[in-house]
Swiss-Prot record:
Record-listed 3-methylthioaspartic acid modification sites: D89
Gene Ontology cellular component terms for the protein in this record: small ribosomal subunit
Domain of life of the native organism: Bacteria
Single annotated GO MF: tRNA binding
Protein name (record): Small ribosomal subunit protein uS12
Gene3D superfamilies: Nucleic acid-binding proteins
Keywords from the UniProt entry: Methylation, Ribonucleoprotein, Ribosomal protein, RNA-binding, rRNA-binding, tRNA-binding
Disulfide pattern: none
Length: 125
């Protein structure tokens, strides 16, 4: 606990804001080009082959981004849109690829939570 005199001399320091997605530079999304598309294994206790892509952004940063949903059409040189949001069981993955935007196609046969996966509304019979 500081004394009044110490507060008069120094004052209180406000905590510096630290972004969880620094490569976006305060933008909601950023465009980038896939350099590598691969699978990655999660931390314990989970087990899977998670689909990730290494993406070079327009601002020069290179980040690892998660490809959500079942199946994807991404390969090297695909142009993708990146948003913030980490994947808890993949260390170092702090970004998500936006499905249904640019070269990333939406998830096929998706009925629920369609807007999150860029899936069109199915035709009514």
């Amino acid at each position: 606990m500081p004394t009044i005199n110490q507060l008069v001399r120094k004052g209180r320091k406000t905590a510096e804001y630290k972004s969880n997605s620094p490569a976006l530079k305060q933008c909601p999304q950023k465009r980038g080009v896939c350099t590598v598309v691969k699978t990655s294994t999660p931390k314990k206790p989970n087990s899977a082959l998670r689909k990730v892509a290494r993406v070079r952004l327009t601002n020069g940063y290179e980040v690892t981004a998660y490809i959500p949903g079942i199946g994807h059409n991404l390969q090297e040189h695909s142009v993708v849109l990146i948003r913030g949001g980490r994947v808890k069981d993949l260390p170092g993955v702090r970004y998500h690829i936006v499905r249904g935007a640019l070269d990333a196609a939406g998830v096929a046969n998706r009925m629920q939570a369609r807007s999150k996966y860029g899936a069109k509304k199915p035709k009514q019979k």
